[in-house]
């Protein structure tokens, strides 16, 4: 809660006039508790889980009906009906209601402990972006090791096998997981803000962006126009799809966001080998077609 009764008091305390965004933030949050602001994450996660994968539903239905977008489908032999995707969404919402939502309600003391602030001044764009980069890097590294644990025999059989029920991922399957996996993967997500605490708005943005990234990674489509193609060392849908395609025995492509951990620790060899093999097959096919096209019958 902002400790100022008026905008004028806040301006005097800061030694300057509030920006337009700071004034809007003051008007909205001044009388609200930090706990109430933190619980906004429940609404944001619900909207992300519900709306962000929705365009992929229409893409999948259009592809199944007419072949449109087929060239971008990573596993084109796998088709999902509307009922298949709605069932996945219902399962995710059940987990959201029973686990994710209650976890948000009871985890506020951890936010107090790491001192996520909600007052003024608001963070600058540079501050927010730098913190988000740090959060993604920390989450990626810690998630890598948690994910490797999930692919131990015990971790997979008892927990992670649920997430791998979708060998060809779809957007709604990104948060589809065992309740224990949801809880354990909250640790890597929380590590960044714990190490470099910022503003509540930055925290909201981090939680939303991380889930949006997971949905893109599980989209099942490799769109060449995706802006994530320009992010250095970004894995993306094609990279993570291989992990699901191989299945429970996969010891490759554990990274959640970037590819550097898999490269450093040698857990991308199967993926690199398959990719190189497919490129050789395509090249051989092109040469064969070119050769056959150049042969003229008498």
From Swiss-Prot:
The chain crosses the membrane at residues 42-62, 96-116, 118-138, 189-209. Acts as a rate-limiting enzyme in the sterol pathway via interaction with ACBP1; sterols serve as lipid modulators for gene expression of homeodomain-leucine zipper IV transcription factors. Together with SMO1-2, involved in the maintenance of sterol composition to balance auxin and cytokinin activities during embryogenesis. Interacts with ACBP1. Keywords: Endoplasmic reticulum, Iron, Lipid biosynthesis, Lipid metabolism, Membrane, Monooxygenase, Oxidoreductase, Steroid biosynthesis, Steroid metabolism, Sterol biosynthesis, Sterol metabolism, Transmembrane, Transmembrane helix. A motif (Histidine box-2) lies at residues 160-164. It is found in: Endoplasmic reticulum membrane. A motif (Histidine box-3) lies at residues 239-245. The keyword Kinase does not apply. The histidine box domains may contain the active site and/or be involved in metal ion binding. Its main location: endoplasmic reticulum. GO terms for cellular component: endoplasmic reticulum; endoplasmic reticulum membrane; membrane. One of its GO terms (biological process) is sterol homeostasis. Its cofactor is Fe cation. This is Methylsterol monooxygenase 1-1. Belongs to the sterol desaturase family. A motif (Histidine box-1) lies at residues 147-151.
């Amino acid at each position: 809660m902002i400790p100022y009764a008026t905008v004028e008091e806040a301006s005097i305390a800061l030694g300057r006039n509030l920006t337009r965004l700071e004034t809007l933030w003051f008007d909205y949050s001044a009388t609200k508790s930090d706990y109430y602001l933190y619980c906004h994450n429940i609404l944001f996660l619900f909207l992300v889980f519900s709306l962000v994968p929705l365009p992929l539903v229409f893409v999948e239905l259009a592809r199944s009906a007419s072949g449109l977008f087929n060239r971008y489908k990573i596993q084109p032999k796998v088709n999902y009906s509307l009922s298949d995707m709605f069932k996945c969404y219902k399962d995710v919402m059940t987990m959201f209601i029973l686990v994710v939502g209650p976890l948000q309600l009871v985890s506020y003391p951890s936010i107090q402990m790491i001192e996520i602030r909600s007052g003024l001044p608001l963070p600058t764009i540079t501050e927010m972006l730098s913190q988000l980069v740090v959060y993604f890097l920390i989450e990626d590294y810690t998630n890598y090791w948690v994910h490797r644990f999930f692919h131990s025999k015990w971790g997979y059989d008892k927990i992670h096998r649920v997430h791998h029920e979708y060998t060809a991922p779809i957007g709604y399957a990104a948060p589809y997981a065992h309740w224990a996996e949801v809880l354990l993967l909250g640790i890597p997500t929380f590590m960044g803000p714990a190490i470099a605490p910022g503003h509540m708005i930055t925290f909201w943005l981090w939680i939303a962006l991380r889930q949006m990234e997971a949905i893109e990674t599980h989209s099942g489509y490799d769109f060449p126009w995706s802006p994530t193609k320009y992010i250095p060392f970004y894995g993306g849908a094609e990279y993570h799809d291989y992990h699901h395609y191989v299945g429970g025995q996969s010891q490759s492509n554990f990274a959640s966001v970037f590819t550097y951990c898999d490269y450093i620790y040698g857990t991308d060899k199967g993926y690199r080998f398959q990719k190189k093999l497919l490129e050789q097959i395509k090249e051989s096919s092109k040469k064969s077609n070119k050769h056959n096209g150049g042969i003229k019958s008498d």
